[in-house]
Design a protein with these regions (language model features):
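Cytosolic covalent-transfer regions centered on His/Cys nucleophiles
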Residues: 1-159
Length: 159
């Protein structure tokens, strides 16, 4: 799997308009719904919010990850929101999150999010790429950085 197969100009919200963790989650879920991947978002928001209270979303180094299974999806889907100002996720390192990744996976593949998170972490661990992503003007430019990274020697595929 290549990162650009899941995160591309169609699935990137740039800039993310949310100013809180809850608003970010709503915005990402609503975006999935606008792409006709979901018919409604209320239950998923409730599940993700309650899961977050128990496990706390993975958030550090300016990145937050949400993931859940859904009966409405047949393939692993992702939407990436990028916030220039950052959002307080109560991260253990105290940093605001600028990159919020929401992954929905089918019921029969409850661990497929791990592959996608690993790929995204490989991209974002490059400090130049990370800072460049916050300076762009559109989701098209974000997609170009992802594709350029994939075409470089620094990326890898995960089966």
């Amino acid at each position: 799997m290549k990162l650009s197969e899941k995160i591309n100009k169609k699935t990137i919200i740039y800039p993310l308009g949310a100013s809180s963790k809850e608003d970010a989650l709503h915005e990402l879920l609503d975006y999935f719904q606008s792409l006709d991947y979901l018919t409604a978002t209320t239950k998923l928001f409730s599940y993700l919010s309650s899961k977050d209270k128990i496990f706390n979303s993975v958030a550090s180094r300016g990145v937050a990850y949400h993931y859940h299974t859904s009966i409405e999806v047949n393939d692993t889907l992702a939407v990436l929101g990028i916030s220039k100002k950052g959002i307080d996720y109560n991260a253990t390192d105290g940093l605001f999150c600028h990159f919020i990744l929401l992954i929905l996976e089918p019921m029969n593949s409850p661990n497929s999010h791990r592959k996608l998170i690993n790929l995204f972490q490989e991209l974002i661990k490059n400090p130049t790429i990370k800072s460049n992503l916050l300076e762009l003007d559109s989701s098209n430019e974000v997609e170009k950085i992802i594709i350029d990274w994939e075409n470089s020697d620094n990326s890898f595929d995960i089966l």
